[in-house]
């Protein structure tokens, strides 16, 4: 009989060590975080610790615990319910499915909501098929519009229905990650039909 899978078995020690180091540097900030982690399942708590261990200090200071909890809970659920996600190398899962940040965008809860919206459309699909379907969904929900403001969160692009290339790619990467498809944002320098770098998304 096969042994049951252990969530983040290979990286557990590294995550705990880096989280404790962050907490040591910011004890007053992490005290309430530790209290809230005690109310989470072991897997969700570990996912949250990964986010806090490797996020920039600005994210720690600017956003409440509940924002990151959404990313952690969705990531754990994907790992438990989708064998394709559970089979991913841990480094790919951590960096390109679970992690909350894509670029320098505003961070807001979105993963659980996006999964609920997209999930039925990709039922039974492999990653490649799911990626195409997610791309179609994103095209239905948001179109290109040039802006100069700070990069919006993925959920704000969805609600507004448009965004510049960087915002559209942040939206799409979050949508892909919300259903377990590993993805990241990439830039194409000297893109022929625009003035500067052109943002897109890349499946890992």
Model-predicted regions and their roles:
Residues 1-133, 140, 147, 178:
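N-terminal accessory/pre-domain segments preceding catalytic cores
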């Amino acid at each position: 009989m096969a042994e049951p899978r252990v969530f983040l078995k290979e990286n557990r020690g590294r995550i705990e060590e880096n989280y404790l180091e962050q907490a040591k540097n910011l004890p007053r900030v992490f005290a309430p975080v530790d209290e809230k982690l005690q109310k989470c399942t072991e897997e969700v708590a570990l996912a949250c610790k990964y986010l806090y261990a490797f996020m920039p200090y600005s994210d720690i200071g600017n956003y409440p615990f509940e924002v990151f909890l959404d990313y952690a809970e969705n990531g754990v659920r994907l790992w438990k319910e989708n064998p394709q996600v559970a089979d991913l190398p841990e480094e790919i899962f951590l960096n390109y499915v679970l992690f909350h940040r894509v670029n320098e965008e505003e961070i807001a809860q979105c993963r659980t909501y996006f999964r609920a919206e997209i999930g039925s459309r990709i039922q039974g699909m492999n990653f490649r098929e799911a990626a195409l379907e997610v791309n179609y969904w994103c095209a239905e929900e948001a179109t290109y519009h040039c802006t100069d403001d700070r990069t919006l969160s993925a959920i704000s692009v969805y609600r507004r229905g448009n965004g510049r290339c960087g915002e559209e790619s942040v939206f799409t990467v979050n949508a892909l990650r919300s259903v377990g498809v590993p993805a990241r944002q990439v830039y194409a320098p000297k893109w022929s039909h625009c003035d500067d770098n052109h943002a897109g998304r890349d499946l890992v």
